[in-house]
UniProtKB/Swiss-Prot annotation:
ATP binds at S253, G366, G367, D368, V369, G412. Belongs to the four-carbon acid sugar kinase family. It catalyses: D-erythronate + ATP = 4-phospho-D-erythronate + ADP + H(+). This is D-erythronate kinase. Catalyzes the ATP-dependent phosphorylation of D-erythronate to D-erythronate 4-phosphate. Can also phosphorylate D-threonate and 4-hydroxy-L-threonine, with lower efficiency. The gene is denK. Keywords: ATP-binding, Carbohydrate metabolism, Kinase, Nucleotide-binding, Transferase. Pfam families: NBD_C, SBD_N. Disulfide bonds: none annotated. One of its GO terms (molecular function) is ATP binding.
Length: 439
């Protein structure tokens, strides 16, 4: 049986949400028309995404198409129905949400989360901001087919829907999943059939998803993709994967830009960074113990996160004064840098070896670190395939025990604050349906 059914108003949206789940290892298919045999396809795919091509049609026709699609998939008894909406709220939002609620019955509750943090869409105070600009001040207001002239999400939905619309602010989300659970229950008790929620980060989306799950309500996810991705984790069984779909980031750069980039990754993905004790890596008496500690911590969090990372600093105050440290250890600054890079590389090797293929791709930042990682993995080099952003290359390791492992290498002063997110997103997409030669 299909566990997740996505109903989108256009093909691009159907694919965009589907790929978020596909890259987690779930078997996903998009259908241009209703599947002739929904039950058969439900057995073949974990996720079925259907496009109704209804964004620019009359509201009554949009309602009919979505209702037909939802009704056709009811026999699959999916654990989650999703109404995929445009990230700039174009189209027949109200009629299509109404159609879903009418088909799924009076117990269903539409939870609208319009945020898409990795695409610059956040909702705060009920307002949708696109790269910090109010929605109505963006080009979507001049869209020739489906312009949007408002920014308040609840108002946009309420103007089109026959159902009562509630709102849960960011302040509640920041209190945690229990607060979200209680707020959703209160909205349902108050007779709301649609609830709009704020979210500014991936962590917020995860919190909302967990709260929705804890509520036990029959939630219909209404969003451009990321909320569905987060909520599906509570519906779908963990996929069986021959090789891992996780990314390991090994970051030696200590620049302010790098710290901004890593913070953006933490906000966008389920991420766990471990900060090394660089003094321990430098000290030959403590080096092995620190490598074991950090690699163990990374491995402990492997099952719970999509992106794992090892870094040398978290805050500006942790940046080493190489000259004074070199003087204290009576070695050169170059040797200090080399010991740190070698320590990071040893941690990466240990994680890859012990995780037994759970890590599907590498991201390295800092030239010394990239060289050290290649050497630690006995790779003779990187087969370069593409440029992700200027001065950030995607390729595959050449030789060694991890031959052909996907890798992105980037300098510490490369790109804007979103550059690391772009690289991680690229790498996750590349490895989502990756196949590897038998070992």
């Amino acid at each position: 049986m299909s566990n997740v059914v996505i109903i989108a108003d256009d093909l691009t949206g159907a694919n965009a949400t589907g790929v978020l789940l596909a890259r987690k290892g779930y078997k996903t298919a998009t259908f241009l028309q209703l599947p002739q045999d929904p039950l058969e396809n439900g057995n073949r795919f974990d996720v079925i995404s259907i496009t109704t091509d209804s964004r620019a049609v009359a509201p009554e026709e949009a309602y009919r198409r979505v209702a037909e699609a939802a009704r056709a998939m009811l026999g699959n008894k999916p654990g989650l129905f999703t109404k995929r909406i445009d990230s700039t709220l174009r189209g027949n939002l109200g009629p299509e949400i109404d159609a879903m609620l009418d088909v799924l019955g009076p117990d269903s509750l539409a939870v609208v989360v319009a945020a898409f943090p990795t695409s610059g869409r956040i909702t705060v105070g009920g307002y949708l901001l696109v790269h910090s600009i109010p929605l109505e001040q963006t080009d979507v207001a001049r869209d020739p087919k489906t312009p949007v002239h408002q920014t308040l999400v609840a108002d946009i939905v309420a103007a089109q829907s026959k159902h009562s619309v509630g709102f849960i602010p960011l302040a509640t989300v920041l209190q945690g999943s229990t607060a979200v659970m209680e707020a959703l229950g209160a909205q349902k008790e108050a007779g709301k059939r649609i609830v709009v929620m704020d979210a500014a980060t991936q962590k917020d989306l995860d919190t909302i998803a967990h709260g929705a799950y804890l509520s036990g309500l029959s939630v219909v996810a209404v969003d451009p993709g990321p909320f569905t991705e987060a909520l599906a984790a509570y519906v779908l069984p963990k996929p069986k994967q021959g090789r891992g779909k996780k990314v390991l980031m090994v970051v030696g750069s200590v620049t302010a830009l790098t710290r901004q980039q890593l913070k953006a990754v933490e906000n966008a993905y389920s991420t766990c960074f471990t900060t090394v004790d660089v003094h321990a890596l430098i000290d030959p008496w403590r080096n092995a113990e620190e490598i074991e500690r950090v690699s163990g911590e990374v491995l402990d969090h492997l099952d719970d996160h999509q992106v794992l990372g090892v870094r040398t600093v978290e805050e500006a105050g942790q940046v080493l004064d190489l000259a004074s440290v070199a003087l204290a250890y009576m070695i050169s600054e170059e040797e200090i840098a080399s010991r740190i890079a070698d320590g990071l590389a040893a941690i990466a090797r240990r994680v890859l070896q012990v995780s037994h293929g759970e890590v599907g791709g590498l991201y390295t930042s800092g030239g010394d670190v990239t060289v050290a990682v290649c050497q630690a993995l006995a790779a003779s080099g990187v087969e370069v395939k593409d440029e992700v952003v200027p001065l950030a290359a995607y390729g595959r390791l050449i030789g060694g025990a991890f031959h052909q492992t996907p890798i992105i290498t980037k300098g510490g002063l490369v790109g804007n604050s979103d550059a690391a997110c772009t690289c991680v997103d690229y790498l996750l997409t590349k490895i989502s349906n990756e196949t590897y030669p038998a070992e």
